[in-house]
Amino acid sequence: MRSVLYSYILFLSCIIINGRDIAPHAPSNGKCKDNEYRSRNLCCLSCPPGTYASRLCDSKTNTQCTPCGSDTFTSHNNHLQACLSCNGRCDSNQVETRSCNTTHNRICECSPGYYCLLKGASGCRTCISKTKCGIGYGVSGYTSTGDVICSPCGPGTYSHTVSSTDKCEPVVTSNTFNYIDVEINLYPVNDTSCTRTTTTGLSESISTSELTITMNHKDCDPVFRAEYFSVLNNVATSGFFTGENRYQNTSKICTLNFEIKCNNKDSSSKQLTKTKNDTIMPHSETVTLVGDCLSSVDIYILYSNTNTQDYENDTISYHMGNVLDVNSHMPASCDIHKLITNSQNPTHL
């Protein structure tokens, strides 16, 4: 008896699931219920989410519902005659935030670093890489589609990264620098033409037929961008300087090693001693002279924080022989520039 009753209950359950327990009926006050749809002036049961109408109702039999198959879905009460196909797999620049199942479509959203250019009913259809703000610029906001807005860093702020997320940071007001100015004055020098060679991230050099000035730099965050060289009355003034967009990380020591080499057969060398060494910032220097073609050398190295009120500075100097007067010089760039790319330590010039 119990087995017969259990079978009967199971049979009734199947009928209810398939919508066959209630025959279609006429609308009440011209309306059907929320879980019904209207067909030929009859109110028929809708299929629940996750199923579709494998057989529509007629005057005697209600809707027959069948579960959705793999990669298909219905998310609302319906009388669709087939389930909807889920969206395809997410692109490489997207992440799946909801997987496809019988009641929900797959949803893909943009990965970090991307924004949605074209939205769909279920997530984003097209993701585009966000704009990256360059050195000296920071993220100041976002467009209506989610792309980055870049703005120049104002007074008292800086940025030394290329990023789609970093904002301009407040300047550290002491014990660091964002600008390096190197001045090298030499006597006697005759050749007025020069070649500048840059090995990115490693060294700068100015060479003439008489001598070569090489500056090797290590762990320096400000980027050297330009040089100058001029000769007047056998006195040469030359140098290198950086941009102002990048601050020195105080956990590192910016090291500058200079070699001034005469292009003759004399290979003797000597180290110059600092004559001024006002140091509160993270830097270190050496100067080596190779050869005997010069009788006077002046070197001035200025490390500056250009965003402080009076320019906080460290000044380093080296001297040999007479102090040279270069006030009448008109510095100019070298005639030839050569760039050697160092793939292990790339730096934007």
Curated annotation (Swiss-Prot):
Q: Which InterPro entries match?
A: Poxvirus_TNF-rcpt-II_C, Poxvirus_TNF_rcpt-II, TNF_chemokine_rcpt-like, TNFR/NGFR_Cys_rich_reg, TNFRSF_N_viral
* Glycosylation sites recorded in the entry for this protein: 101, 190, 249, 277, 313
Where in the cell does this protein reside? Secreted
- Tell me the ranges holding the TNFR-Cys repeats: 31-65, 67-108
Which GO molecular function, any one, fits this protein according to its record?
tumor necrosis factor binding
Where is the secretion signal located?
1-19
Q: Does the keyword Disulfide bond apply?
A: yes
For whether the record's keyword set contains Chloroplast, the answer is: no
Q: List the disulfide bonds.
A: 32-43, 44-57, 47-65, 68-83, 86-100, 90-108
GO cellular component terms, semicolon-separated:
extracellular region
> SMART domains given for it?
TNFR
Its predominant location is secreted
What keywords sit in the KW lines?
Answer: Disulfide bond, Glycoprotein, Repeat, Secreted, Signal
According to its UniProt entry, the protein's GO biological process terms are: positive regulation of membrane protein ectodomain proteolysis; regulation of T cell proliferation; symbiont-mediated perturbation of host defense response
Q: Which Pfam families match?
A: CrmD_SECRET (PF07190), TNFR_c6 (PF00020)
Q: What induces it?
A: Expressed in the early phase of the viral replicative cycle.
Its job? Inhibits host immune defense by binding to host TNF and various chemokines in the extracellular space. Binds host CC chemokines (beta chemokines) and CXC chemokines (alpha chemokines).
Question: What family is this protein classified in?
Answer: Belongs to the orthopoxvirus OPG002 family.
Q: What is this protein called?
A: Soluble TNF receptor II
The species this protein belongs to is Monkeypox virus
What high-level taxonomic lineage is stated for the organism? Viruses, Varidnaviria, Bamfordvirae, Nucleocytoviricota, Pokkesviricetes
**Gene name linked to the record:** OPG002
